[in-house]
A protein has these predicted regions:
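Glycine-rich, flexible loop/turn motifs
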Residues: 8, 43, 122
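Extended, low-complexity, intrinsically disordered C-terminal regulatory tails
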Residues: 23-54, 98, 106-108
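Phosphate-binding glycine-rich loops and adjacent basic patches that engage nucleotide phosphates
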Residues: 6-9, 50-57
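Catalytic cores and adjacent binding grooves of peptidoglycan-active enzymes
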Residues: 13, 59-130
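Active-site acidic/histidine clusters and adjacent loop/turn architecture
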Residues: 1-33
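A general structural signal for well-ordered alpha-helical packing
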Residues: 19-23, 44-45, 69, 89
Length: 130
């Protein structure tokens, strides 16, 4: 069974309990890495300046404590494999639904099951709703 690294565990611990519950279940089935949980002001604004996020601090879901968002990708990481990211997200979304956790994925912001209609794709991004 896959396990999180120490770093992934630390990042996940900075997240909302619902995200912790969800991704602690996901890791039992699919090997994945927690790339980011809570973000500092400096980190959020740096990512904004690099065009990797659309909002400055404190307007991001990563900026609350605990974080309402986390960035997670299947392991090993392959940024070029869009299909793998989408398949992983489908598993996560299904798992969340079965657990009664409402989330939104950065590969389908409007959650209409159309992944080609986004102006900004953020495939590793998952956030709790409500």
């Amino acid at each position: 069974m896959p396990r999180y690294s120490k770093r992934s565990k630390e990042r996940l611990a900075s997240c909302d309990q619902r995200l912790q519950d969800l991704f602690n279940e996901v890791i039992k089935h699919i090997d994945c890495s927690i790339l980011e949980g809570n973000r500092s002001k400096e980190r959020q604004n740096k990512l904004y300046d690099e065009g990797k996020t659309k909002v400055r601090y404190p307007n991001g879901r990563h900026n609350s404590n605990p974080s309402k968002a986390c960035d997670v990708t299947p392991y090993p990481v392959d940024w070029e494999d869009r299909e793998r990211q989408t398949l992983f997200a489908g598993f996560v979304l299904g798992m969340a639904r079965s657990m009664g956790i409402s989330i939104r994925w950065g590969g389908d912001w409007d959650m209409d099951f159309q992944v080609m209609d986004n102006r900004f794709d953020d495939f590793p991004h998952f956030e709790v709703r409500g």
